[in-house]
Amino acid sequence: MALYEHVFLARQDISAQQVDALVEQYKGVIEANGGKVGRIENWGLKSLTYRIKKNRKAHYALMDIDAPAAAVHEMERQMRISEDVLRYMTIAVEKHEEGPSAMMQKRDRDDRPRRDGDRPERSFGDRDRGPRPDRGDREDRPRRPREDRV
């Protein structure tokens, strides 16, 4: 059996539970045709770069599949029929990645505290930083003439 990574985009107006139901439905199709589904990741609702079927956002989901080609073709056929699936892409891979995908790592990285989280809050008040001795005394400089505006 071949190894595949499969990503699909579901419509923005369905709930996260419905996305999970779609994943389970397609997992059932793969298993019914003699395959196995490994890692399943739900990347959540994300903005699209451009509109797809009048949608600006979509729910992203990733599945690692170990199945014969016929099982993948059947799953893709059902995705083409489904109104809830906007796009899908299946890629044959040599081996599945261990651990979370790059998208999940990025999401985890966003949750951690920032590097400067330890610093105290800066207070500039009215932004007065005091005299600037490198500029010299500006009191004796003549004022710039202003043009009369009409």
Swiss-Prot record:
InterPro entries: Ribosomal_bS6, Ribosomal_bS6_sf, Ribosomal_S6_plastid/chlpt, Transl_elong_EF1B/ribsomal_bS6. One of its GO terms (biological process) is translation. Residues 94-150 are annotated as: Disordered. GO terms for cellular component: cytosolic small ribosomal subunit. Keywords: Ribonucleoprotein, Ribosomal protein, RNA-binding, rRNA-binding. Transmembrane segments: none annotated. One of its GO terms (molecular function) is structural constituent of ribosome. Pfam families: Ribosomal_S6. The keyword Hydrolase does not apply. The keyword Ribosomal protein applies. It comes from the Bacteria. PANTHER family: MITOCHONDRIAL 28S RIBOSOMAL PROTEIN S6, SMALL RIBOSOMAL SUBUNIT PROTEIN BS6M. NCBIfam families: S6. HAMAP family: Ribosomal_bS6. Belongs to the bacterial ribosomal protein bS6 family. Binds together with bS18 to 16S ribosomal RNA. This is Small ribosomal subunit protein bS6. It comes from Rhizobium rhizogenes (strain K84 / ATCC BAA-868).
